[in-house]
Amino acid sequence: MKIIKNIFNKIDPHFQKGGKFEKMYPAYDAFRTMAFVPSHTSTSGAHIRDAVDLKRTMITVIIALLPALFFGMWNIGQLHFSAIGEQFTLMEAFMFGFWKMLPMILVSYGVGLGIEFAFAISRGHQVNEGYLVTGLLIPMVMPVDVPLWMLAVSVVFAVIIGKEVFGGTGMNILNPALTARAFLFFAYPSWMSGDQVWISGLSEIDGVSGATPLADLASETNILELERYSYSISDMLFG
């Protein structure tokens, strides 16, 4: 870590006021404070000097999100393999979901942080760290089969309209992740609603769900007759 810190100390003057990269200071500061605790303190009032800043707080929130993210990845895989009738292990289901989610997470962070850096540099203020959490929440609330370009457009709308126009992190009245989902719902409703079931790479699967099976279930008077659908009471209760 000392080597990395020496590198930052060496290039630091180029990003300070009067340096040739002065305008890029917000981007430089974002990377430096991600690696090391900021050296500055608040200007007034009672405060305690410690290593917990907004970046570290956001990292804590990300760690809290990981169990839900990992479960979602596994669930994507197990629903896929169950629908096509194949045997699978826990790791196979998890890795299937992992490779489906990874591009979405990369696009979300790439587009969102790019906008955050652009706004910070143009305004001359520090990069808002709030998107570290938002960038993970947006893929988690989106359909797994949404095209990446739609995801990117939703991220642009959420960050600019749902956040930056209000002043950035802490001043927005809209939740950026839900704003992205709402935008996609109204702009491309066919991707967000309907009775189509997602099964990766397969369209010929029949009988998983849909309007007809659900209508048949709703019209049954004897719960025992539901056994012909291979739905147990526990399946209907817990999913």
Label every PLM stretch briefly:
Residues 52-53, 99-101, 117-127, 143-146:
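Short, amphipathic, aromatic/basic-enriched membrane-interface segments that mark the entry/exit
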Residues 104-118, 135, 155-163:
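Central hydrophobic cores of alpha-helical transmembrane segments in multi-pass inner-membrane proteins
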Residues 170-239:
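Long hydrophobic alpha-helical segments that form multi-pass transmembrane helix bundles
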